[in-house]
């Protein structure tokens, strides 16, 4: 390819569909039965209503409108290049497809992005790369397995060579969705880069 554009929704659904077609189970069921239950990891992809009481609401800070309006009043050529890149990204087709259009309802209204992740629909959905829910201990346990060669307590999750392949740089450069930042990606992981150490 000639460019990169972060898109968690597409990436997760593509891999989830491969799992479903090869194995027959949804990605949430597969993760639960093959990883979470086996390694006692408190993490789920797609919640049951009974899990909601354990789930904290996300509270996102919206950009202060006075800051946005301040930058809109300044001629573009006077803005620092980083601010110009952010503005260009927010108005780009790629950004809108990745983060705005997905929130449209059937009547074409854009849902409140700050409230959407707290809805029952979002929490129940199995969105492989975007809405896993887990405890801090569960996330730490999962990544401790990966950081220790893919095994724990005599059970193997991944081979070391698979982990090495997943964390090998496959894509780098200005990202068309993430504000033209110099991000690096492996196979499923954002890698160490100036803006994402």
Give residue ranges: language-model regions.
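Short, surface-exposed loop or secondary-structure junction motifs
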Residues: 1-196
């Amino acid at each position: 390819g000639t460019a990169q554009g972060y898109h968690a929704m597409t990436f997760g659904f593509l891999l989830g569909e491969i799992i479903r077609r090869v194995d027959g189970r949804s990605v949430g069921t597969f993760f639960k039965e093959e990883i979470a239950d086996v390694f006692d990891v408190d993490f789920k992809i797609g919640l049951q209503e009974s899990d909601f009481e354990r789930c904290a609401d996300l509270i996102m800070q919206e950009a202060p409108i006075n800051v946005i309006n301040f930058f809109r009043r300044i001629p573009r050529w006077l803005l620092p290049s980083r601010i110009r890149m952010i503005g260009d990204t927010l108005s780009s087709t790629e950004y809108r497809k990745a983060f705005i259009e997905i929130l449209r309802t059937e009547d074409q209204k854009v849902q409140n992005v700050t409230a959407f992740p707290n809805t029952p629909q979002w929490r129940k959905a199995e969105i492989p790369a975007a809405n896993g829910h887990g405890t801090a201990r569960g996330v730490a346990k999962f990544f401790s397995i990966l950081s220790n060669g893919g095994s724990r307590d005599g059970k193997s999750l991944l081979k070391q060579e698979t982990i090495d392949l997943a964390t090998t740089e496959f894509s780098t450069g200005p990202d068309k969705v993430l504000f033209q930042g110099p991000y690096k990606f492996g196979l499923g992981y954002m890698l160490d880069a100036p803006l994402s150490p």
